[in-house]
């Protein structure tokens, strides 16, 4: 997660249910994307929850070796990307949604 309240609140139900201690990776760091990837790679073979922002998640997915998703609207809070890291180093991504659907924002170019 990042230091911001929205990402922490999104992660909180999972953190509480599984008794986890979240790792905070500052979103304001110039090396944020690589810092997140480094943290993920510390847990090979494990499931890692990354709660991020519309302007960083696509780059994180790509940095993990999967196809970069399209732009995400700032007003969309229901996107979920599952990156599957294969043993051979290849990665793939599945895009889904969760929870209550975000209202359709017709002003967002990414949704047109």
Label every PLM stretch briefly:
Residues 1-23, 89-112:
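Conserved histidine-centered catalytic loops in small-molecule metabolism enzymes
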Residues 26-28, 52-53, 76-80, 110-112:
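Short, surface-exposed, polar/charged, turn-prone segments marking secondary-structure boundaries
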Residues 38, 81-82, 103, 108:
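Low-complexity, compositionally biased segments
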Residues 58-64, 85-98:
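Ligand-binding grooves and catalytic loops that recognize ribose/phosphate and carbohydrate rings
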């Amino acid at each position: 997660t990042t230091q911001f309240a929205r990402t922490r609140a999104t992660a909180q139900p999972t953190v509480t249910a599984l008794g986890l201690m979240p790792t905070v990776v500052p979103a304001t760091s110039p090396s944020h994307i690589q810092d997140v990837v480094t943290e993920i790679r510390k847990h090979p073979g494990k499931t890692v929850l990354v709660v991020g922002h519309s302007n960083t998640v696509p780059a994180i997915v790509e940095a993990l070796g999967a196809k970069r998703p399209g732009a995400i609207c700032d007003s969309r809070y229901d996107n979920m990307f599952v990156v599957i890291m294969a043993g051979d180093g290849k990665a793939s991504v599945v895009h889904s949604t969760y929870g209550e659907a975000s209202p359709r924002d017709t002003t967002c170019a990414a949704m047109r």
